[in-house]
A protein has these predicted regions:
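A short acidic, glycine-rich active-site loop
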Residues: 51-63, 200-213
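Generic structural signal for helix capping and beta-alpha/helix-loop junctions
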Residues: 42, 92, 142-143, 190, ...
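Gly/Ser-rich helix-loop-strand patches that form or flank binding pockets
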Residues: 23-27, 90, 95-144, 246-290
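Hinge/beta->alpha junction and helix N-cap segments in small-molecule ligand-binding domains
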Residues: 57, 158-160, 185-188, 204-210, ...
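Structural beta-alpha unit
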Residues: 13, 20, 47, 51-55, ...
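General small-molecule cofactor/ligand-binding pocket signal
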Residues: 33-35, 81-85, 134, 181-183, ...
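Small/aliphatic-rich secondary-structure junction motif
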Residues: 1-50, 150-200, 224, 252
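Intrinsically disordered or low-complexity boundary/linker segments at protein termini
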Residues: 1-16, 75, 101-107, 124-167, ...
């Protein structure tokens, strides 16, 4: 399935995800498919206390149709494809998103504990998808009051995945006429129990190397059509905290799923994981090859 796939479960997080997905579909001229996973113990009457043993896929589809129309309006809802799947939500979304240009999920769904930063479905999708994925938090906005996207922050570390993230962000910024801020983080090596080794490390040299890496990545991306040049930020400290701090007041964060560190077999790196959990705005995570 190509285009955008968005998970829907009638929660506030799903409403925010659906609105985000609808805007992306219009900008990129992609098809939009809303997916509702249902089961006989997870029905959609608007009353969670009601259990109907005769509940059917047609009833699930009607619930999905009504919800999309409620969130986007009846006219916009006619442009949204619907898919109902009798399966576990994460598995239904991952299967539906095979070949998709973007998978969009709300940060939190109907179930689970409110104290958790990400729900179980969004976490499973985040860790197992091989497609670009957007994590969207619920906000007190309506389609009429949704602000234009003005700032996009991108994490860069010199890896091919971070280059792909910057390219994706630039394409998004070009469509939205938004600014792009590319951030690279650096720090001195941890010498542990051998502090005297640190005298051989020159902070200026490490900072210069980070800036050179950032320049190499940014200069290699076609930024034509942006309202202003890409801003380059060299941050001393942890990459994830630098991205989150810089993104205060931003409208979107874009990071690669895996950077230069960690274990190559993992689909999601520590920076992407931390940013997805703590970001103050929607996050798009780009896998290798996109």
């Amino acid at each position: 399935m190509t285009g955008i796939v968005v998970g829907v479960d009638e929660s506030d997080g799903a409403a925010a995800a659906l609105r985000f997905a609808s805007r992306e579909a219009h900008l990129h001229r992609w098809d939009l498919t809303a997916v509702l996973a249902w089961g006989y113990l997870n029905q959609h009457h608007g009353d969670l206390s009601v259990f109907d043993p005769e509940y059917s896929e047609s009833q699930a589809d009607e619930a999905l149709r009504a919800y999309v129309a409620k969130v986007l309006g009846p006219d916009e809802a006619t442009h949204v494809r619907r898919r109902t799947v009798c399966d576990l939500p994460a598995r239904a979304l991952l299967e539906s998103a095979t070949g998709a240009d973007l998978l969009v999920v709300g940060a939190r769904g109907r179930g689970g504990f409110k104290s958790l930063l990400l729900g179980s479905v969004s976490q499973q999708c985040l860790h197992h998808t091989t497609r670009p994925i957007a994590i969207v938090r619920a906000v007190e906005r309506t389609p009429e009051t949704e602000p234009a996207m003005e700032r996009i922050v991108v994490g860069v570390d010199g890896s091919q995945t971070s280059r792909a993230a910057l390219e994706w962000a630039v394409q998004e910024a070009r469509l939205r006429q938004a600014s792009v801020e590319a951030l690279i983080a650096w720090h001195l090596p941890n010498v542990g129990a051998f502090p005297y080794v640190g005298t051989a490390f020159d902070p200026a040299a490490f900072e210069a190397a980070a800036r050179e890496t950032l320049d190499h990545i940014v200069d290699g991306v076609d930024a034509e059509g942006l309202p202003r040049p890409i801003e380059r930020i060299v941050h001393l400290g942890d990459a994830s905290s630098g991205i989150i701090t810089t993104a205060k007041g931003a409208d979107l964060i874009v990071v690669g799923s895996r950077g230069l560190g960690g274990f190559s077999g993992l689909l999601l790196g520590s920076v992407g994981h931390h940013v997805a959990h703590h970001a103050p705005c929607p996050v798009v995570i780009i896998p290798p090859g996109d």
